[in-house]
Amino acid sequence: MRYTVFKACKELVAAAVLLSGTVLTGQAALSETLTGALVKAYKNNAPLNSSRAGVRIQDENVAIAKSAYRPQITGSYNISRGKTPATDYRTTGTVGIQLNQMLFDGFQTRNNVAAAETQVFAQRENLRNDEQNTLYQAVAAYMDVYQLRQIAALREKNLAAMNEQVRAARARLDVGEGTRTDVAQAEASRSTAIAALNAARADVKTAEATYMQVVGSLPDKLTPASAARHLPQSPSQAYASALASHPGILATKYAVNAAGYNVKAKEGALLPTIGLTASASQLDTIAGTDMGDGNTASIGVGVNIPIYTGGRTSAQIRQSKEQLGQARIEVDVVQDKVRQAISSAWSQLEAARASVAANRDGIAAAQLALDGVIEERKVGQRTTLDVLNAQNDLVAVQIALVQAEHDVVVASYALLNATGRMTADQLGLQVAQYKPEEHYKAVKDKWFGLRTPDGR
């Protein structure tokens, strides 16, 4: 009987040992890194690639605006056949060409070009903002998978420990040292552990699906990640940095400039326009056996002076001024959002760091408490329920540490993102960076051509 009781106690200690390690010794041999995931997201993320296409679309608006500076040339050809009572059937053909060149349009084209160019700069900043958000989402997706895999592993260890508790409780019952209540309590805790493990595995699958969506590939084995470096020293320093470099703020400032140019362009519609027109044509006539032809050419300058347009021009000017006012307000809106994001990220980072320290101390205390409860249980001073509760306390604090370490990394990158310093270049990612100015230079002064710069 003593041997059987001793064996049951050994099994109880073994269950505690299963929980004594903090997290996953096998993590040392993992292959995928956070930097590698960021590189993949930079290259593969579909919404980010869509934003890049949006910049290229905006580039073409500059070429469209500049087209008003250039001549508009049209050709024409007409043929007709008719007869009058006094003549035979007559076939007439006319071929002609006409050129229209704007000489002055109240500075509308100049301001439209300036607005289009400024909108290109705004779109580039929006792209940089999307790039930052994508990389931050990749960090969050990476850390979510890593955290939830750790939690699932802890749940597996906890289930193994509960299995040991059930076996130990049954062994004590067999030798008369325990009760059926002890066995029932152990089995109930094991059932709870099974449910928690299943939920943890489901969470892992969900996180892996999000990782696939953001990064563009399924997560392999992941290595631990550290917090972002070169963080600001205070919230005020972070906000000062954001005012100078956050792409969201810069984009709204460019939008204000573009709206200002748009107001000037609309006001230009009140001014006279001057245009040059040149044309040439050839007329060929066939009537029976007779043939005739004639050539004409003309050139002229015309002036159009707007007098009244039914209120349309005035309404467009007022509308553009309201759009300018809205754009100025949007600057304040984005600045407030950035300030809030910095404050939130800073608070979360501080709380997570404090939580890491507290939970590390908590693990040591919970492990000591579990060891003590097991020893006291051996001499009858504690019940099986006390042991189960102590084990659950240890698992809870281990999971809390995993979550706190996850939060430190994510909050540090959230702070970096909020300050506007989370681009591929600033993170030092070894990847061929997308350069929007290359497409812009290729199309901004293009006079003709249907193919895009990449050959489509």
Curated annotation (Swiss-Prot):
Taxonomic superkingdom: Bacteria
GO MF, any single term: efflux transmembrane transporter activity
Compartmental location: Cell outer membrane
Disulfide bonds: none
GO cellular component: cell outer membrane; efflux pump complex
Coiled coil: 312-341
Biological process per Gene Ontology, one example term: response to antibiotic
Classification via Pfam families: OEP (PF02321)
Recorded phenotype for the gene knockout or disruption: Mutation strongly affects resistance to bile salts and toxic chemicals, and significantly decreases the resistance to antibiotics such as erythromycin, ampicillin, tetracycline, and norfloxacin. The mutant also has attenuated effects in the mouse model of infection.
Signal peptide: 1-28
Transmembrane annotation, as ranges: none
Gene3D superfamilies, per the entry: Outer membrane efflux proteins (OEP) (1.20.1600.10)
UniProt entry keywords in alphabetical sequence: Antibiotic resistance, Cell outer membrane, Coiled coil, Membrane, Signal, Transmembrane, Transmembrane beta strand, Transport
InterPro entries (alphabetical): Bacterial_OMF, OMP_efflux, T1SS_OMP_TolC
Family: Belongs to the outer membrane factor (OMF) (TC 1.B.17) family.
PANTHER family named among the record's database cross-references: OUTER MEMBRANE EFFLUX PROTEIN, OUTER MEMBRANE PROTEIN TOLC
Function: Involved in the efflux of toxic and relatively hydrophobic compounds. Influences survival inside the host.
UniProt subunit comment: Probably part of a tripartite efflux pump, which is composed of an outer membrane efflux protein, an inner membrane protein and a protein that expands the periplasmic space. Could form a tripartite pump with BepD and BepE or with BepF and BepG.
Name of the molecule in the record: Outer membrane efflux protein BepC
Species, as recorded: Brucella suis biovar 1 (strain 1330)
Gene (name only): bepC
